[in-house]
């Protein structure tokens, strides 16, 4: 798929995500919408991963560290062929289901249970180090929320990533600047996030528009060429991206959209020039 087709796919999957949250009567919709292009770029443009190679020790590895954005993750996994979207919508967030509100590695395609913030990067450091020790060529990716960076374990892992020169590790910060209690800078300010990661020995790539497939593609390609140190992408995204009523509003961190809200999610893709 080209960049335009991938952008359309991201909006299609936003619709699936909204439908899932409505059916389940709850979900972290704001972060789902902001991270969608990152997930689409990883799964449909970058990573060596498919339902057919999940037992391949050379497959790329992904951990959704900001596990509360699981609805977007489920939608992408379903499109990739790991899950059935109809079943997900029927069972999501229901009593006794495996389709719970955070990633569950009993489901196909999910490497790690996550959602307790600050755990994804430490585990990915271990995965990347194992790859180096076993002389494997796979790459390891994790997506973190910017609010998650208040967890100290993130920075312990960042220090270890530099120590072991894990150039097969790429972290992505979904930098939408909002969390459940408001603006991230008011809750626990990050100062200059780029310089902070650089001070820990990481190669830092600023993605000016983290909802641009083309910019994300270029950033991931640069990360692949970076040697001797891990890479972090600071993806500047918009919480609630794709919906006129949700964009850049902390109140949509966890919310169930109305029928009118669902319509706006599709209408706001008109800039792609693609008819639904």
Feature names for model-found ranges:
Residues 263-276:
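Single conserved hydrophobic/aromatic residue that forms the stacking wall/gate
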Residues 203, 213-266:
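Glycine/aspartate-rich loop-and-adjacent alpha/beta segment that forms the canonical ThDP
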Residues 5, 17-20, 32-163:
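Cofactor-binding active-site loop characterized by glycine-rich and histidine/acidic residues
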Residues 109, 113-116, 121-226:
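Thiamine diphosphate
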Residues 10-26, 174-176:
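N-terminal capping segment at the start of a domain
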Residues 28, 68, 100-102, 119, ...:
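Histidine-centered active-site/metal-ligand motif
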Residues 1-13:
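N-terminal hydrophobic or amphipathic helices/low-complexity stretches enriched
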Residues 68-69, 73, 176-177, 237-240:
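Glycine-rich beta-alpha junction loops
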């Amino acid at each position: 798929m080209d960049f335009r087709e991938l952008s359309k796919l991201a909006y299609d999957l936003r619709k699936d995500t909204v439908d899932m949250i409505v059916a389940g009567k709850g979900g972290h919709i704001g972060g789902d919408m902001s991270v969608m292009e990152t997930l689409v770029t990883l799964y449909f443009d970058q990573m060596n991963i498919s339902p057919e190679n999940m037992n391949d020790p050379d497959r790329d590895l992904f951990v959704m560290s900001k596990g509360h954005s699981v609805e977007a993750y489920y939608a992408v996994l379903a499109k990739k062929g790991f899950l059935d979207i109809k079943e997900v919508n029927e069972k999501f967030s229901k009593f006794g289901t495996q389709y719970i509100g955070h990633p569950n590695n009993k489901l196909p395609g999910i490497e790690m249970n996550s959602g307790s913030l600050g755990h994804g990067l430490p585990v990915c450091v271990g995965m990347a180090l194992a790859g180096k020790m076993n002389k494997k060529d796979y790459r390891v990716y994790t997506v973190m929320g910017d609010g998650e960076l208040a967890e100290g374990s993130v920075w312990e892992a960042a220090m270890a990533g530099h120590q072991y020169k894990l150039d097969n590790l790429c972290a992505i910060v979904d930098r939408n600047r909002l969390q459940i209690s408001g603006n991230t800078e008011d809750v626990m300010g990050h100062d200059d996030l780029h310089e902070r990661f650089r001070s820990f020995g990481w190669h830092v790539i600023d993605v000016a528009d983290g909802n641009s497939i083309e910019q994300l593609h270029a950033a991931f390609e640069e990360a692949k060429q970076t040697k001797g140190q891990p890479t972090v992408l600071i993806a500047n995204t918009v919480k609630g991206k794709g919906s006129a009523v949700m964009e850049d509003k902390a109140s949509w961190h966890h919310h169930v959209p109305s029928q009118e809200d669902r319509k706006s999610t599709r209408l706001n893709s008109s800039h792609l020039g693609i008819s639904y």
